[in-house]
Amino acid sequence: MITAKAVKELRERTGAGMMDCKKALTETNGDMEKAVEVLREKGLAAAAKKAGRVAAEGIVKTYVSEDMKKGSIVEINCETDFVALNEEFVGFAGRVAELVANSNVNTVEELLAEKLDGDKTVQEVLTELIAKIGENMSVRRFERFSVESGLVQSYIHGGGRIGVMAELACEASSPVLAEVAKDVCMQIAAANPLFLSEADVDQESLEKEKEIYRAQALNEGKPEHIVDKMVMGRIKKYCKEVCLLDQAWVKDGDKSIAKLLEEKSKEVGSPITITKFVRFERGEGIEKKEENFAEEVAKMGGK
């Protein structure tokens, strides 16, 4: 006979519904371990069905080691903002971020094959979470950071909507370095720079911008001899918008990020440079499916 206590235990272990737990125990003649396997198998089937659904919500999570010498940033997606706030989902994202920082994986495929909880791989834990919560989820991307002289810093905005990580190099050890690194991360979150400096802007993009500005100037009827000067002026303005070092600091519009680093370098007695940064915005680039409410109602009604 299947007891209520056994059903409760199985439910706590698997997160499956009460009726599903009772059926699994009945099917396995009360064998708890076999019942867990049965539910996992059913969970895997359910997860496979959900894999076709668009997961454009989710969370960006960061991890920085205590000594601030290494860190990582990951984006993990789900289908709804409600699940993005789920404690288990958020906890999973945090554990994956820490795993990335302490591993040598280079691709999402390699990451999914890494052990996360005991003998379970990231993929296995993710699949179980999909089955338990009932939404499609995916590990989308990650970036790992490591520095010898300097530190790694992160910033999360909007409860995981935007995440930033930056790597700053400096020979000096000072609390000021962590402060400026946090300011840099907040700048990246707010201003969304595409490049570190003008030297990093790819020439193809720069030439395209020049062509656009030249055409605009000529269409405005500007004389040919001043068009080049106008184009260069507009390119400078473009670089101030997309290059981190050229951007006006969000906390003080009269000061560029390059100027901020220069001042802080003098304060700590050693040059501070930004060697790497990344900004993840949840769901960016994912095409969301437009839902047709009438169709959904018709489907539910079996029409």
Curated annotation (Swiss-Prot):
It is found in: Cytoplasm. The keyword Acyltransferase does not apply. Keywords: Cytoplasm, Elongation factor, Protein biosynthesis. InterPro entries: EF-Ts_dimer_sf (IPR036402), Transl_elong_EFTs/EF1B (IPR001816), Transl_elong_EFTs/EF1B_dimer (IPR014039), Transl_elong_Ts_CS (IPR018101), UBA-like_sf (IPR009060). Disulfide bonds: none annotated. SUPFAM superfamilies: Elongation factor Ts (EF-Ts), dimerisation domain, UBA-like. GO terms for molecular function: translation elongation factor activity. One of its GO terms (cellular component) is cytoplasm. It holds the Pfam family EF_TS. Residues 80-83 are annotated as: Involved in Mg(2+) ion dislocation from EF-Tu. Its main location: cytoplasm. CDD domains: UBA_EF-Ts (cd14275). Associates with the EF-Tu.GDP complex and induces the exchange of GDP to GTP. It remains bound to the aminoacyl-tRNA.EF-Tu.GTP complex up to the GTP hydrolysis stage on the ribosome. This is Elongation factor Ts. It comes from Clostridium perfringens (strain 13 / Type A).
